[in-house]
Every structure is written in structure tokens, then in C-alpha cells.
Amino acid sequence: MKVHIDEEADALYLRLDESKIIESEEVYPGIVLDFNEQNQLVGIEVLQLSSRINLTTKNIKVEISQS
């Protein structure tokens, strides 16, 4: 898993898998999900990031559960 924050673009990209992205879907304004050939989620893009979280925060806790 890779996380990239682009402050200039005001966006965050979370890459869950390195497989080829076949389809993207905006599921909520500014939230885009990327899917591979098996329709599995492989990436999450969050636009207008600074309006959603405080970018000056030094630590951000994220809980990830696998099903």
C-alpha cells in the first residue's frame, strides 16, 4: 500500500494494489475509487483534501481492517 499527498493539487492518493486500473468511479464529490479487471478496489483518490482534514496535523491514525 502506498500513500501520496500532493499539496499543490490538494489531493491524497491511496494505492492499495499495483494492478492495472480499468475503471474509476466518483462515489461522492471529490472521492474517486479505482478498480482493476476483477472489479477489486485498487486505489482511492481524495480531492480538496485541505477542506476535509487539517494538513498541519503531524500524526494521522488510520485503522484498516481486512475482511
Task: Label each PLM-derived region with a short phrase.
Residues M1-S67:
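Small, basic N-terminal interaction modules of short regulatory proteins
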